[in-house]
């Protein structure tokens, strides 16, 4: 039989020393050790197939149960997986909106939150605040509520994304023009100064009324500034 030439291993992000190594080679410098080979042979890989046709809540619960060890996923990162499985095009539109410059400028979250898909979560909340009949802040299980509601919107398939994108951009253009990066930060009336991190509660309080009356507030920017400041009084 023809002898097959064995290719060397290639490195990974977390195992760079694998580069150029062989499973078993006479040259010890480029070969895995006996102990390393035994460890690999005895290791187990858990594979669970989550069917696209499965109930969405069951999928979310399964992702949560699997979300142990290794790199921990944020609730929004898990939610992204479910949204992609349900409607990839819908996910891409949410993702594109999350990259809008004045949205990012108006919602200055931490680098860690950004890496954990925090901006995309705020876009999800934008839609839920505009379309949901329930009070987001009163939900007993907040993350499950967000997942259920965004999947319900996907199922209904009645969102005019061009119109929503226009309202979204007008909203955050206006917020950044009027409040700079301070619209969702606590306002101190005595010091006439905003400070601290972005407050989710402020976002949930401001967005519904502003988006419903965006044309009015575009013509009445001083009133908008006062309305936002009153949220923190």
Question: What does each model-identified segment do?
Answer:
Residues 2-144, 218:
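Basic- and aromatic-enriched surface patches that contact anionic nucleotides/nucleic acids
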Residues 119-233:
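C-terminal subdomains that position terminal phosphate/3'-OH groups for nucleotidyl transfer/ligation
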């Amino acid at each position: 039989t023809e002898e097959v030439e064995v290719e060397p291993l290639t490195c990974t992000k977390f195992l760079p020393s694998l580069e150029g190594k062989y499973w078993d080679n006479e040259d010890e410098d480029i070969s895995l050790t006996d102990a390393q080979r035994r460890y690999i042979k005895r290791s187990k890989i858990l594979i669970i197939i989550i069917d696209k046709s499965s109930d969405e809540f069951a999928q979310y619960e399964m992702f949560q149960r699997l979300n142990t060890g290794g790199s921990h996923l944020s609730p929004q990162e898990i939610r992204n997986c479910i949204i992609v499985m349900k409607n990839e095009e819908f996910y891409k539109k949410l993702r594109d909106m999350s990259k809008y410059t004045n949205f990012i400028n108006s919602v200055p979250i931490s680098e860690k939150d950004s890496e954990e898909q925090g901006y995309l979560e705020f876009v999800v909340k934008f839609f839920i605040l505009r379309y949901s009949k329930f009070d987001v802040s009163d939900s007993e299980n907040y993350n499950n509520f967000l997942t259920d509601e965004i999947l319900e919107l996907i199922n209904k398939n009645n969102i005019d994304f061009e119109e929503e994108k226009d309202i979204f951009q007008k909203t955050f253009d206006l917020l950044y023009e009027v409040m700079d990066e301070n619209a969702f930060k606590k306002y101190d009336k005595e010091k006439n100064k905003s400070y601290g991190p972005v407050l989710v509660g402020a976002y949930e309080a401001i967005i519904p009324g502003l988006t419903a009356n965006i044309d009015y507030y575009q013509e009445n920017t001083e009133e908008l500034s006062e309305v936002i400041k009153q949220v923190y009084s």
